[in-house]
């Protein structure tokens, strides 16, 4: 009986935390916040241990420390977190070029993204039995890093981009060979989710004007998701999710459909989004985000249970992405905005660095959200050719 009572108290306590987070004003993103996130990445990109290797051994020669196997991306606990930890530093240097962390971030990037290190990374990927290595999650983040470097008008960035290019090209070839063979999408809330990977791939293809890759990715998204209806959002989340299967799907489809197409598709796909209410800041009668409430990790020190802290962040950016593709007079905007703000507040509050289990990756999710990286405002010809949303901004 005491045990059951304790569980009830814990559950109520978690609800109170989520409710308080949802009612707080959204945190300001400025140079101070950027420094906090940069410190998380700087603390891990060169931190080799602890390390979780996803590694196929072909012989005794493959038994080696991470710094020998993948010298560019041997920190931050695992390969994909190291990749997006480096992306975080590039993104923040572009956003705050004169910040206090700039010199340290540049030096960390210089050491990691050297030509020699990245040649070794490419050799590792070519190893026998590694065709599925970090596919699609890590490879998609690698493309996000590559695109960020290409967009940065900076001499060091151009050098690092050239160093990364062979690995980048290898990732594209891997994904181009894999996507046509993928018979069904992977609809989970973790690394293998197809929708999230497709979104990163498509953003890369459009940034780099790789039209053939953009068409392949857009066609895959349409094949997998265009006929979907009534996504069971009430079944989310699973206990170890850091991505939303339903929102992730909507977030990639707003990239490949026109505004008119997406507005109709979303009605069929997520009919549970409330249709009434004023924006959250408009006083009495304002829309509530209660239709999709933030979650709380029951144990941020557990590497899997800490995923729920990241779920709040990714839900927030996916909700904002959906908003960016809807007409200004769409009656769902207020409810979407309310839910996005609640998740943003709860998600950013959890990015503390108190536990390495979350500290090695949550900063990247926070920066992806706060810099609106997933909402590309450049209406390029490549985007229009491949069915980009007609409306670029939120």
Label for each model-derived stretch:
Residues 26-31, 66-83, 123-140, 181-194, ...:
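Solvent-exposed loop and edge beta-strand segments that line ligand/cofactor-binding
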Residues 68, 83, 90-208:
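Extended ligand-binding groove/face enriched in aromatic
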Residues 23-74:
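Low-complexity, Ser/Thr/Pro/Gly-enriched N-terminal "stalk/linker" regions
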Residues 6-16:
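Bacterial N-terminal signal peptides
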Residues 17-21:
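Sec/Tat signal peptide C-region and signal peptidase I cleavage site
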Residues 2, 280-285, 379-394:
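Intrinsic disorder/low-complexity segments
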Residues 24-29, 39-43, 83-99, 140-156, ...:
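Well-ordered alpha-helical scaffold segments within catalytic/enzyme domains
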Residues 206-282, 286-361:
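Long, repeat-rich segments with strong aromatic
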